[in-house]
């Protein structure tokens, strides 16, 4: 297993699930950067990064963003939250499987880097 997220999807690696649908999985990050830090991934490994999104495969991205909004409401993030997607080595991406981070639960700094 080369992809840790595929291992989580397959049930080979445990996770604290927060949301699951037919094509999206969300779970608590194992090294949280905020009180609420949830990772959202497509269950299919077809898209490895933001630059792999096309019109043909963008439906799963729309589903991920709908799931992020739903989970943010469920987590009580009414005061605000941040969604992050690292793209490529220089963007800080460490897992070659498209994923988005939902961060919240406290006031986040205004800096992006």
Regions found by a protein language model. Give the residues of each.
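HIT superfamily nucleotide-processing domains
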Residues: 1-113
């Amino acid at each position: 297993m080369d992809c840790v997220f595929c291992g989580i999807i397959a049930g080979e690696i445990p996770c604290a699930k927060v949301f699951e649908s037919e094509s999206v999985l969300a779970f608590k990050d194992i090294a949280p950067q905020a009180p609420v830090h949830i990772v959202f991934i497509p269950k299919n490994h077809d898209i490895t990064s933001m630059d792999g999104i096309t019109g043909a495969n963008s439906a799963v991205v729309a589903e991920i963003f709908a799931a992020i909004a739903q989970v943010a409401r469920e987590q009580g993030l009414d005061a605000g939250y941040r969604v992050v997607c690292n793209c490529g080595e220089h963007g800080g991406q460490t897992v070659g499987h498209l994923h988005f981070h939902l961060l919240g639960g406290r006031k986040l700094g205004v800096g992006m880097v």
